[in-house]
Regions:
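AMP-dependent adenylate-forming
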Residues: 2-26, 135-159
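Structural core segment of the AMP-binding/adenylate-forming
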Residues: 2-3, 69-145, 203-224
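ANL superfamily AMP-binding
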Residues: 11, 32-55, 73, 162-178
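Conserved AMP-binding
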Residues: 57-61, 181-185
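Conserved short alpha-helical elements in the N-terminal third of ANL/AMP-binding
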Residues: 70-73, 188-202
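Conserved binding-pocket/active-site segment within a compact domain
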Residues: 178-179, 204
Length: 224
């Protein structure tokens, strides 16, 4: 999993196109840095450990990719079907339902330094907290390869050992893959893992972004 994130250290690994001409490009090194900081936040601030469940209530977005990779690095279970979990990561903290040990609010705009407005009591502001955490992650407890890594929307479960062989989509070697965010978080995660495993990279596009020939050519989209 570390190789998937950090490969191609100086070249694009994950590119995001969002509303209002937003473009975010993460090289392998920068992607790994974001995952390390988020993993440290989970472990050091929220006492996350292998086997804990994280409800990932976010749309397909570059930050939801970071959260999934971080949870897997700790050996956690990423919950996509809205089921029970100890932690909730959401961009909708004002509509909380269910009981969680901790709730983390994620502001989606790339330049957001904190949540825009007042948060419910006890909710952690991801944008305000994540940058203070370390750039290198060292797990306190070794995760189990046989533990559940993801609980998908249709009820399927995949263990950590089988994330690539059982969950990730198959893609051509070195693909520069266009992933429409409109298809949802689960397919986006599967596509991204498959593209990275093949030595490729991902362009993730918000549903409101017009996928013009100019954009596709500029990003050198190729392969399947």
């Amino acid at each position: 999993m570390t190789t998937l994130r950090s490969g191609h250290a100086t070249s694009p690994r994950l590119t995001w196109y969002g509303p209002d001409s937003e473009r975010v490009e993460l090289s392998g090194r920068v992607l790994d840095n974001w995952v390390a900081k988020t993993s440290n936040l989970l472990q050091d601030e929220l006492d996350a450990e292998p086997g804990m469940r994280l409800n990932l209530d976010l749309p397909a977005h570059w930050k939801s990719m970071i959260w999934a990779l971080s949870a897997w690095q700790l050996g956690m279970e990423t919950v996509l079907d809205g089921g029970e979990a100890e932690l909730l990561v959401t961009d909708r903290p004002g509509t909380l339902e269910g009981k969680y040990d901790a709730v983390i609010a994620v502001a989606l705009p790339a330049l957001a330094m904190r949540w825009p407005g007042e948060l419910p009591a006890g909710v952690l502001d991801y944008a305000a907290e994540v940058r203070s955490h370390g750039d290198v992650f060292m797990a306190h407890t070794d995760p189990s390869a046989a533990a559940c890594a993801i609980r998908a929307r249709a009820g399927q479960q995949h263990i950590h050992e089988n994330l690539i062989t059982g969950f990730a989509a198959s893609h051509e070697e070195g693909v520069r893959l266009l992933v429409p965010a409109s298809e949802g978080l689960e397919p986006a995660l599967a596509d991204a893992l498959g593209a990275w495993h093949s030595g490729g990279s991902v362009v993730l596009a918000h549903p409101d972004v017009e996928l013009t020939d100019k954009l596709l050519n500029a990003e050198r989209i190729h392969g399947k």
